[in-house]
């Protein structure tokens, strides 16, 4: 065999082994990737976010903006999002809006209204958030995560 052939074959063999290893690790990496967040964790995170909002109020939340009150018994995540999505220019509730959209099975857009709104009653965003927080804490204690 030619003396230069051995190092060349060795280098090609190592490159093939390295490429095989990279491909195998890439394929197996999908098995270790995180799955969907359990509903209990998502609800706990939403509760924590609402606690942060209510505790860190130095000025009126969202400049005292008003939202439609909602029925907190059924389909409340989408109804809450529908109310809050109509508040513009309030960075304090943006994370809450994103979190609520994770609980709502359909896309919600501004101006959309559900039958779950109590259409004759508007309340301040701060009171809305407090009411929602109390209700979510109750659901969490009762183990109702969906």
UniProtKB/Swiss-Prot annotation:
GO cellular component entries: cytoplasm; external side of plasma membrane; extracellular region; extracellular space
Pfam name, any one: IL13
GO-annotated molecular function: cytokine activity; interleukin-13 receptor binding
Annotated signal peptide: 1-24
Job description of the protein: Cytokine that plays important roles in allergic inflammation and immune response to parasite infection. Synergizes with IL2 in regulating interferon-gamma synthesis. Stimulates B-cell proliferation, and activation of eosinophils, basophils, and mast cells. Plays an important role in controlling IL33 activity by modulating the production of transmembrane and soluble forms of interleukin-1 receptor-like 1/IL1RL1.
Quaternary structure annotation from Swiss-Prot or TrEMBL: Interacts with IL13RA2.
Record protein name field: Interleukin-13
Species per Swiss-Prot/TrEMBL record: Homo sapiens (Human)
Gene: IL13
């Amino acid at each position: 065999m030619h003396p230069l052939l051995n190092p060349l074959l060795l280098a090609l063999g190592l490159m093939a082994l390295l490429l095989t290893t990279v491909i195998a690790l890439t394929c197996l990496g999908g098995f270790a990737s995180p799955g969907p967040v359990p509903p209990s964790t998502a609800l706990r995170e939403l509760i924590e976010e609402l606690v942060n909002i209510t505790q860190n109020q130095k000025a009126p939340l969202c400049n005292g903006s008003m939202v439609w009150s909602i029925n907190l018994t059924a389909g409340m995540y989408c109804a809450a999002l529908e109310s809050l999505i109509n508040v513009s220019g309030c960075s304090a509730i943006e994370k809450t809006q994103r979190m609520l959209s994770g609980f709502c099975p359909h896309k919600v857009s501004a101006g959309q209204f559900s039958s779950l709104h109590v259409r004759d009653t508007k309340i301040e965003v701060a009171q809305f958030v407090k009411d929602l927080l109390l209700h979510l804490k109750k659901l969490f204690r009762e183990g109702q995560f969906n």
